[in-house]
Amino acid sequence: MRNFTLSICVVFFSVTVKAQLTEKIETDRPDQTESPYTVPKKWFQSETGFAIENDKSGTKAFAHPTMLNKYGLSKRFELRLITEFISFQTPVIIPQGNDIVTGLQPIEIGGKLALLEEKKARPKISLIFHTAIPKTASKQFQQTNWVPNFRFTMQNSLSEFISLGYNLGMEWYGEEETKPSFIYTFAPGFNLSEKWYAYLEVFGFLNPDNHPQHSVDGGIAYNFSNNTKIDLSGGFGITKNTSLKNYVALGFSFRLPVEKY
C-alpha cells in the first residue's frame, strides 16, 4: 500500500508540473454518461475507480479497481482498454460467513470516434464501442462469446456553467439466448468554480425480456490541475424491478504526453 501511494504521488506531481494543456482533462467518469471528448493526440489518459455496489438480492460488488486507459491516436480517435478487478459477496448462511468470489472481468478493448462538433442546437457527438474478450477473464468470470457494446455520446453547452450530456446505445451479454439491452443516460453538469464540478443523472437499461431498470446518481469532481482530477459519486435504483439498490464510488484520473507535441 505504501508503494502504491508513493506511485500515485509521483504520477500526480509529474503530470501537474511537466505536462499542461490549456483545456481541463475530460473524463468518462464519475457519471454513467460517457463524454464525447477524445484524448489529445499522442497523450495517454488513465481513469481509475473504486466502488461498492449493493443490489436488492443482498449481493455486494466491490470494484478494486476498475481502470479505463486511453491513448489519442489522432485528433478525432482514441484507443481504449478497460480492466476491472472485482469481488462479489453473496449472502449465504454458512458458519464461515458470506461467500466471496474475486477475479478479473473480461478485458474490453475499443475506441472513441469524434463524429460532429457542437453547432447551435446540434450537440457534440462521438461514437464509443468496445468488445469484451472472453478468455482474458479469471476462470470464474470467463464467458463463451465476445461481448460487444456501443453508444452514441452527445453534449450540449447550455451556458458557460451548465452542460447537458446524454447517451444512447446497446450492450450484449455473454449468453446467446439473451437479448441485448438498450442503454440511456441523461446528465446535466454544473461548473461550480474553476476547479469544482457537479452533476445529477438519470440512467437505465431496457431489455425486451425484463422490466425496465431506472436509476439516479450524482457526484462531484475536483481538478488539481488541467491534467489531474478526483471524483466522488453515488446513486440508487428508483424502480421496483431495478436490481441496483445503491452504490458509492471514488476515482482518480490523470493524463500525460507520450511524445513532445
Predicted ranges, named:
Residues 1-23:
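Bacterial Sec-dependent N-terminal signal peptides
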Residues 20-261:
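Transmembrane beta-barrel domains of Gram-negative outer membranes and organellar outer membranes
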